[in-house]
Amino acid sequence: MVHWTAEEKAAITSVWQKVNVEHDGHDALGRLLIVYPWTQRYFSNFGNLSNSAAVAGNAKVQAHGKKVLSAVGNAISHIDSVKSSLQQLSKIHATELFVDPENFKRFGGVLVIVLGAKLGTAFTPKVQAAWEKFIAVLVDGLSQGYN
């Protein structure tokens, strides 16, 4: 079990209150698909992802980005039991979708960039440290279904 300080919890939840899951989810997933183009193989049914403009205008990327950030929000709402809250989602990604768990780390890194860009100077090093810790816990939880 992870120990969270009150300051870390406050940093994570205060940032999360500023997140627009639809917009920021689209931004984060779109960035993942552009920066790491090989991740597009998991989204072959999304249609045209051939360039930045196509990804930015893709409604399926927007919808799935919202879904992903909604799952992040659910994990935040279970911050004291993140790993157990992600058991089913981990199992799906491992046994049905066959997602390489390294991509969870990549998405986490992209999400931190999106949050930093959104918040500017309010995304202080202490806030970033709390988010980096949360992302590590999130990745660990999502990776638990892999043997």
From Swiss-Prot:
Pfam families found in the cross-reference section? Globin
What InterPro entries would the database entry show? Globin, Globin-like_sf, Globin/Proto, Hemoglobin_b, Hemoglobin_oxygen_transport
Q: Which BP terms in the Gene Ontology apply to this protein? A: hydrogen peroxide catabolic process
Instruction: Give any Gene Ontology cellular component.
Output: haptoglobin-hemoglobin complex
The residues that the entry says bind heme b are H64, H93
Span-the-membrane segments of this chain are none
Q: Which domain of life is it from?
A: Eukaryota
Q: Does the keyword Heme apply?
A: yes
Q: Does the keyword Transport apply?
A: yes
Q: Which GO terms describe its molecular function?
A: haptoglobin binding; heme binding; metal ion binding; organic acid binding; oxygen binding; oxygen carrier activity; peroxidase activity
> What positions does the domain Globin occupy?
3-147
Family designation: Belongs to the globin family.
Function description: Involved in oxygen transport from the lung to the various peripheral tissues.
Assembly, in brief, is: Heterotetramer of two alpha chains and two beta chains.
Protein's name in the database: Hemoglobin subunit beta-2
Organism per entry:
Xenopus laevis
The record's gene field reads hbb2
